[in-house]
Structure formats: structure tokens, C-alpha cells
Amino acid sequence: MAGHSQFANIKHRKGAQDAKRAKLFTKLRKEIIVAARSGSPVPELNPNLRSAIASAKAFNLPKDRIEAAIRSAQGNEADDSYEEITYEGYGPGSVAIVVHALSNNRNRTAGELRHIFTRHGGKLGERGSISYLFDHVGLIVYGAAQVGSFDVIFDEATSLGAIDLEEHDNGEEKEYHVICQVEDFGRIRDALYEKFSDGVTARLSWRPKQKVKPASDEASAKLISFLNDLDDNDDVQYVEGDFEL
């Protein structure tokens, strides 16, 4: 029985991992479709698509699925007609939250997000309700293996006019986040792509002016549970906030 229980636990974990991977692949596919429809279906002529493909490759989305998403973008299927929507609100512990979604049904997405916020003791707000707590910036992310060292990308980013460079640990490797003014984003992204190849992520971002730490381990656990529920929503692409875990 113990052996059977262990097998069942492994099978359950694998099933959960497969489901999470499937959700991630679906989100990457949607990002590619929206990017391809924003301009040319040729990545070299469409920086948004090039960035979306780079993100997809970083998370191991198979090449045939990337190509299928680009083909889908050239069709007129209603289910693949996505709208970019930004939601703002307060999560547990009054942390400011910005949710970036791609949806083919605005009412459904708003209802589902409102339910998640409310269930975790937060509140979904109106557009602009928390934006004053953030700066709108450009963000280009590289893995450490892509650039060699902090000093290398620091020198390059600084020479291009970036306003900051942050070092992060994503659990697998170090990442370098190049921060720039919105008006400089395209120029700096393209120059870095030319120097280091495509980054893991390149997009406009909401950067908190100040970060707040949860008051306790219990508060941290509540916030993580809330963020996990947001991430599990099919329409949510990514979440930003003024929290520090």
C-alpha cells in the first residue's frame, strides 16, 4: 500500500505539473497571436512578435506550436480574437496589484478577477485607481548565460541610456532586468537584441515607486495564495505589484 501511495502521489504531482505547463503554453500562444496581429507575421519585421517568440522559446514552447500560433493570427477565428486589458486593484494586505490580461470576453474576465480579489480580501478597482503608485517603464530581461556577467550588460545598458539594471534570481539562474524610459524602449530593446540576441522578456512594465513587505509569514502566505489564483486564471498573462516577497 505504501508503494501504491507513493506512486499515486508522484502521478498526482506530475498531473499538476502537466496542467500548469499546459496553461503556460496557452498563455504564450495567446501572446504570439496578439503580437502577430499587431504588425507583420514576420518576426524580423515585427519587434512585438519577435519578443513574444523569444519568451515562448525561453519556456520551451515547441517550434511547431509557435508556427501554428502565427498562422492562427492570420485567420479570423472568434476564439482567437483577444483584447489586451489591464486591471488594477488591492490584494490582501492592501498591496497594489496590476493584472495584465488577454481576453476574448471582457465581461467574463472582469467577473472572474473580481471574484478572486474578493475571495482573498482584496478589491478590484477602477482603471487609474493605483497607477500613481507606479512608474511606467520599458523592461528587457536577459538570463545571465545570455550576457555573461552583470558588468557586461551594465556597461552596454548604461551606454544606451537605460535608467537602471536589476539583478534577480528566478530559482534557476540569475536574470538581469534592464529598465528604461518608455520613449527609449524600442531603441534600447533593438540595440540589446543586436548585441546579445533576443531577451527572455521585452515589454512595457509598471514599476512600483516603493515596495512593501508583508507584515508576517501568514500575510506572505495569503499573498502567495492570491497570486497563484490569479496566475491560474486562463486570461491572466502576468501580474505586477508593489509587494516584495
Curated annotation (Swiss-Prot):
Annotated InterPro entries: Integrase-like_N, TACO1_YebC-like_2nd/3rd_dom, TACO1_YebC_N, Transcrip_reg_TACO1-like, Transcrip_reg_TACO1-like_dom3, YebC-like
Record's keyword annotation contains Magnesium: no
Source organism, top-level taxon: Bacteria
Main location: cytoplasm
One MF annotation (Gene Ontology) recorded for this entry: DNA binding
Subcellular location as annotated: Cytoplasm
Key words of the record: Cytoplasm, DNA-binding, Transcription, Transcription regulation
A biological process term (GO) from this entry: regulation of DNA-templated transcription
NCBIfam families for the chain: PRK00110.1 (NF001030), PRK12378.1 (NF009044), YebC/PmpR family DNA-binding transcriptional regulator (TIGR01033)
PANTHER family in the cross-refs: PTHR12532:SF11, TRANSLATIONAL ACTIVATOR OF CYTOCHROME C OXIDASE 1 (PTHR12532)
The protein's name: Probable transcriptional regulatory protein APH_0480
